[in-house]
Amino acid sequence: MGSRLAPCRRFGKCDGRMASQYSPPPRHEPVFNLPSAVVWLLAVLVLIQAGRSLLSDYDDYVLMSWLAFVPARLTLWLSPGRLDDVVGAMAQSTAGQDVADRLHLVRLLLADGGVRLWTLLTYGFLHGSWLHLVSNAVWLAAFGSPVARRLGPGRFLNLMALATIGGALLHWWSRDLDVLPLVGASAGISGATAAAVRFVFAPGLRFGDLGDDAVVRAIPAEPLGQLWRNSRALLFIAVWFVTNILFGAGLVPIFGEETSIAWEAHIGGFVVGLLLFPLLDRGQQRR
């Protein structure tokens, strides 16, 4: 069986070291063959969601106020004079709620005047519901796994973190007066998805190959200029953008969810992943 030599034949030249690396006979792979970085990240997300489920509603909201990203906080830190604008926007977004609830929201999210810059990252560890977490977990396992195999744990987590921050910043830019907390790992996962687009649509690549570290690292990554000539990659990107915009605009209902989709954060994370992937990539590059 020559399956271990496949990446050399399909994706480039092999020297003696690479040939020996790919030469071991095939072994039985587990059904869920996830990289350790993905497994540990999923475990952390599940443990956080489980821990929050044990908190009272008030304590959970306090936790959210410290870890979720609130665009209006960053706006007031940068432009303190826009307090009236924030209050007006909050009155519109919380219309129909009790006045006491509004005051409670202001006290928790805005009263201390702190910007809490760490929330640009920590919001990615929180989720609105178990369904929200499960949907993100499935997407992370599918698209984060090949990226984690190619980059290694450290670079993969750095990419996720940068995409998470990029998603928060684009969300803030588009909704700078919003007092509603932003939560979810979707921006980071969108960044990993964009990174995967740079190499998973290589000609001749089979889906089963993405479970092999050596194969994934041997696939030449598409330069951004050439990516637009890859019809499969372009189709995926188009479907991804259209789907996110439709869900974000509320044109397509979200089963079991009452919250809206922060599609701007998804797009911000996707763009960061697409652009920064080459800086972190340690695999083959297509010339």
Segments from the language model and where they lie:
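A detector for small-residue-rich transmembrane helices and their helix-helix packing motifs
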Residues: 10-287
